[in-house]
């Protein structure tokens, strides 16, 4: 959405079911004039139940066995990959082998060109991730977006305990030869790491209405 607002050619890649929710989603994209690469498949359209705790932090109940778990790698998607300069993908969409295989084929099909961006925006939700999926994604991306809680989990899984957050970020940046690592820390601000350089931005104090999607918009 944000990329299209800047006038760039962008696509939303996913899958929806042959149901009313799928129709509604396609209608919203059409209304907002957003380009899509969304397949209609014989699985129900995905839904998420979101509840907020006392501090406004969202908790998610994500339904399984849904359309976006089964995104096919079509000839049209292959053509898109061959002409893509930047892509953003996450870990949640890889919880099912079908969509994981499609995401990996898309990334591997993209031509290696200067300035190319493969952005991995980790979304550690429930138990929908494995060390193998995360390692493969680290190896395929060149930009990593992560929050402080996810960084602690990743450090525990990969054996980086007992060091501060910045040290963990430098380790990931070097180990996977990343162009950039973006760390968000909620009310404690955010960091951007590039080889040899780190910048910090404080979080502005604003009334919190709903934090759902705040990390994605960042």
Task: Please report, for each region that a protein language model flagged, where it lies by residue.
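Acidic, amphipathic alpha-helical patches
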Residues: 76-77, 134, 169, 208
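Gly/Ala-rich phosphate-binding loop of Rossmann-like dinucleotide-binding domains
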Residues: 4-5
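Conserved phosphate-binding/catalytic region of the ribokinase-like
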Residues: 158, 162-218
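Conserved beta-alpha-beta core of the PfkB/ribokinase-like small-molecule kinase fold
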Residues: 86, 90-167, 171
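Conserved N-terminal subdomain of the carbohydrate kinase-like
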Residues: 8-91, 108, 112-114
């Amino acid at each position: 959405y944000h990329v299209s607002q800047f006038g760039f050619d962008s696509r939303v890649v996913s899958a929806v079911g042959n149901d009313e929710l799928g129709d509604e989603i396609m209608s919203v994209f059409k209304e907002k004039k957003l380009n899509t690469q969304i397949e209609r498949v014989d699985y129900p359209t995905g839904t998420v139940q979101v509840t907020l705790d006392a501090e406004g932090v969202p908790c998610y109940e994500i339904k399984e066995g849904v359309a976006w778990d089964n995104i096919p790698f079509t000839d049209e998607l292959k053509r898109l990959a061959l002409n893509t300069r930047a892509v953003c993908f996450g870990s949640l969409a890889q919880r099912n082998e079908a969509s994981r295989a499609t995401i990996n084929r898309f990334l591997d099909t993209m031509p290696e060109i200067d300035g190319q961006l493969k952005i991995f925006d980790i979304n550690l939700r429930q138990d929908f991730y494995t060390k193998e999926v995360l390692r493969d994604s680290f190896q395929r991306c060149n930009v990593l977006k992560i929050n402080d809680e996810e960084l602690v989990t990743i450090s525990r899984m990969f054996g980086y305990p007992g060091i501060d957050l910045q040290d963990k970020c430098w380790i990931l940046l070097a180990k996977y030869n990343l162009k950039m690592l973006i760390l968000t820390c909620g009310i404690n601000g955010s960091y951007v790491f590039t080889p040899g350089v780190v910048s910090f931005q404080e979080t502005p104090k604003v009334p919190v209405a709903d934090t759902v999607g705040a990390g994605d918009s960042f």
